[in-house]
Amino acid sequence: MLILSPVDRADEAPALIDAGAEELYAGYVPPYWKEAFGPVVSCNRRSFDEANAGSFGELEELVRAASLRDVPVHVALNAAPIPGGMIPRLVETASDLARIGVRGVIVSDLSLLLALREAKFRRFALVAGTLFSAFNGMAVAFLRRAGAERVVLAREMSAEEIGAVVRTAGGTRIEAIGFRGRCPNIEGFCTHLHDDPGRTWPCELRYEKSWAGPGEAIPPQVLAAIGRNEGTDRFFSCGLCAIPLLERCGVHALKIVGRGSETARKVDAVRAVAAMREWGRKNIPGAAESAARGKALYLDTFGRPCRPENCYFPEFRPSAGHSWVMPGREG
């Protein structure tokens, strides 16, 4: 299983690769898109400057820096939906990206995916992004027919569900998101913009609340459900416990979230994922062992214990009983 890391600038690439990243992905907003939609609506769901290469030339430098270490770079063009008039222009942009050595694009709009399929760029992967909400093998098969050779699964899935999809994916390579950026909503159905340079998204804010249901007060269980996500810092999201088992079930790449974050944070994330993967390869652990090791590594990485609201794979928490067992192993 490869480690796929975000990258924003050429000078970050060596440190990320040294930490263990084997693939990188970046953001880029073409000038014509900025002219059409202004500074808020991005073609890759990140509008603040830190999350995108500053120019096409800077992106080319980034690709060159990664290629010196034989590490491929993908570029996110994963806005959805995309206005029809922009599809041909983004296909032209993809052609320019292929020319400078970008190895693929991440897309989340079906019309763009189909147009890129028809363009038939050589050695250029079409990656179906997580906004397609691929929760099952039928969704993966549909996206494969639409041109995707890689699919990023919905980030709300359990490790067992991911393993089941991998078994039916055939030649389609599967990516799973598993570190930083856990979404409290079903991401593919969420219309929030991710445009705050401070990286506090609308789903993390505390809102005034009113109640229109039966009774005079908001029921405690409703308040508790809301409180699980309010004020949550997605920087602390983690799925380390599942990494050894995801690798053994055939996930192609573990994707780390974090375009626009500081270089040190990206490097720490890559190191943590690489350390958990290496430990899993040496020990071939069951679920309970993975859970214990993941929690210890989380504490080392963040300096605090893991919490339920930050957990990508809650089935690895003690209350879940580690119900998933890989064939031939006891949890």
PLM region descriptions:
Residues 1-132, 152, 158-331:
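Active-site pocket-lining/capping segments in soluble small-molecule metabolic enzymes
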Residues 136-138:
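Conserved nucleotide-cofactor-binding alpha/beta core module
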